[in-house]
């Protein structure tokens, strides 16, 4: 894995999980 590429995406996805209660990818 490229830390620079995956690190930012994973952080964004984790942040979205807080809002994405339905798990459908939309807030």
Curated annotation (Swiss-Prot):
Family matches, as InterPro entries: EF-hand-dom_pair (IPR011992), EF_hand_dom (IPR002048)
Q: Whose protein is this, by species?
A: Lytechinus pictus
User: Could you tell me which residue ranges the EF-hand domain spans?
Assistant: 7-27
| Family classification | Belongs to the calmodulin family.
Please report the name of this protein according to its UniProt entry: Calmodulin
Q: Which UniProt keywords apply?
A: Calcium, Metal-binding, Repeat
**Any idea which GO molecular function terms this record carries?**
calcium ion binding
Residues given in the record as Ca(2+) binding sites:
20, 22, 24
Q: Which purpose does this protein serve, as stated in its record? A: Calmodulin mediates the control of a large number of enzymes, ion channels and other proteins by Ca(2+). Among the enzymes to be stimulated by the calmodulin-Ca(2+) complex are a number of protein kinases and phosphatases.
